[in-house]
């Protein structure tokens, strides 16, 4: 295994304190050493089981503990999920992420989850799931089905974590990431900016991620979307430059990871998103109308790509093909009509 730089919170905090333009310059230099700066990986997210989650994550409208008006739904049928995946591929996404609002999957659900992974893989798309805590057997079963990525965010620093979540320990999250990695599945893990954390907490989160035995292949950075009925509905807005700093520091600390703009993009203007790409972000959730939090519509994403000279990255899976790249290229040139989104699309990053 490659040797990765071990970071301290002090070192990470020093990056946050750099003059912004110096920080962006360093992040962009590092980004160009490892990635094509014009390529952006695009994913679509689907809620396969919505609401009624027993967890108490203070930011999440899917928790059964808060009255947010969200209607809970049972686990979707495999056929419904695959139909949504077809629409996502037709719209140009190269990775299909499936999220379920529960603490952990039950044994009765595993055969359906495996079929979902197998079906999406057969379409030539990368697969990702976020299902909560996994044990060793579950991780290996999903790996055998062909799962490419597993998302399980750390959310914030270990020190601040207990102020946001009490129903799942920080160590439990780290243990799940370890089981996923040991099963041969790529790790997707990041956090949220705007929970009420300090800059030191942001530094602490990124240190936890960067100092994993191997840094996550994908690091989603979310901006808190304040939902009425959740305990954080009245939190202060996140300063755009502070969010951009977080993207830049993540890029510097994890040079080979994809850094994803996740929840909260609807709150960002084009200039903020452009600076995030400049800071090293190179992945987005594309064209999904998120179930519990809004996300820019497909045509807006495509128009922004065109303005910035960005290109959607082609996937490389066992069953991959060039059709996805061609579809996106055509849409960038002629973004007049796009497939309808399912109302099931949402941000399941947590």
Swiss-Prot record:
BP GO terms, sorted: biotin biosynthetic process
EC number: 2.8.1.6
Chain sites annotated for binding [4Fe-4S] cluster: 53, 57, 60
Gene3D superfamilies linked: Aldolase class I
Organism: Yersinia enterocolitica serotype O:8 / biotype 1B (strain NCTC 13174 / 8081)
InterPro entries the UniProt entry points to: Aldolase_TIM (IPR013785), BATS_dom (IPR010722), Biotin_synth/BioAB (IPR002684), Biotin_synthase (IPR024177), Elp3/MiaA/NifB-like_rSAM (IPR006638), rSAM (IPR007197)
CDD domains per the UniProt record, alphabetical: Radical_SAM (cd01335)
Binding site for [2Fe-2S] cluster: 97, 128, 188, 260
Primary role: Catalyzes the conversion of dethiobiotin (DTB) to biotin by the insertion of a sulfur atom into dethiobiotin via a radical-based mechanism.
Subunit: Homodimer.
Pathway: Cofactor biosynthesis; biotin biosynthesis; biotin from 7,8-diaminononanoate: step 2/2
Cofactor requirements of the protein: [4Fe-4S] cluster; [2Fe-2S] cluster
Keywords: 2Fe-2S, 4Fe-4S, Biotin biosynthesis, Iron, Iron-sulfur, Metal-binding, S-adenosyl-L-methionine, Transferase
Gene: bioB
Entry keyword annotation includes S-adenosyl-L-methionine: yes
Reactions catalysed according to its record: (4R,5S)-dethiobiotin + (sulfur carrier)-SH + 2 reduced [2Fe-2S]-[ferredoxin] + 2 S-adenosyl-L-methionine = (sulfur carrier)-H + biotin + 2 5'-deoxyadenosine + 2 L-methionine + 2 oxidized [2Fe-2S]-[ferredoxin]
PROSITE patterns: RADICAL_SAM (PS51918)
Radical SAM core domain segment(s): 38-262
PANTHER family given in the database record: BIOTIN SYNTHASE, BIOTIN SYNTHASE, MITOCHONDRIAL
Cofactor, free-text remark: Binds 1 [4Fe-4S] cluster. The cluster is coordinated with 3 cysteines and an exchangeable S-adenosyl-L-methionine.
Family note: Belongs to the radical SAM superfamily. Biotin synthase family.
Protein's recorded name: Biotin synthase
GO terms for MF: 2 iron, 2 sulfur cluster binding; 4 iron, 4 sulfur cluster binding; biotin synthase activity; iron ion binding
């Amino acid at each position: 295994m490659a040797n990765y730089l071990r970071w301290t919170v002090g070192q990470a905090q020093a990056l946050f304190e750099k003059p912004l333009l110096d920080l962006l310059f360093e992040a962009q230099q590092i980004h160009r050493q490892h990635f094509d700066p014009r390529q952006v990986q695009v994913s679509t997210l689907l809620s396969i089981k919505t609401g009624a989650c027993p967890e108490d994550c203070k930011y999440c409208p899917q928790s059964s503990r808060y009255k947010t008006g969200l209607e809970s739904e049972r686990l979707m049928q495999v056929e419904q999920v695959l139909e949504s995946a077809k629409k996502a591929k037709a719209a140009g996404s190269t990775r299909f992420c499936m999220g379920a609002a529960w603490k952990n999957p039950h044994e009765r659900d595993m055969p359906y989850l495996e079929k979902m992974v197998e079906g999406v893989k057969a379409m030539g798309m990368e697969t990702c799931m976020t299902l909560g805590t996994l044990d060793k057997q579950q991780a290996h079963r999903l790996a055998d089905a062909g799962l490419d990525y597993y998302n399980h965010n750390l959310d914030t620093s270990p020190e601040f974590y207990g102020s946001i979540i009490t129903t799942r320990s920080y160590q439990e999250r780290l243990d799940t990431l370890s089981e996923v990695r040991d099963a041969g599945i790529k790790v997707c893990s990041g956090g949220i900016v705007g929970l009420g954390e300090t800059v030191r907490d942001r530094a602490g989160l990124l240190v936890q991620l960067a100092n994993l035995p191997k840094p996550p292949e994908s690091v989603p950075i979310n901006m808190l979307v304040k939902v009425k009925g959740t305990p954080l509905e009245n939190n202060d807005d996140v300063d755009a430059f502070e969010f951009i700093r977080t993207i830049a520091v993540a890029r510097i600390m994890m040079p080979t990871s994809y850094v994803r703009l996740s929840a909260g993009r609807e709150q960002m203007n084009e200039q903020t998103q452009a600076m995030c790409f400049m800071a090293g972000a190179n992945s987005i959730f594309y064209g999904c109308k998120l179930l519990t939090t809004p996300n820019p519509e497909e045509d807006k994403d495509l128009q922004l790509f065109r303005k910035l000279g960005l290109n959607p990255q082609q996937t490389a899976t066992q069953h991959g093909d060039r059709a996805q790249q061609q579809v996106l290229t055509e849409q960038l040139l002629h973004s007049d009509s796009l497939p309808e989104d399912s109302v099931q699309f949402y941000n399941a990053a947590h």
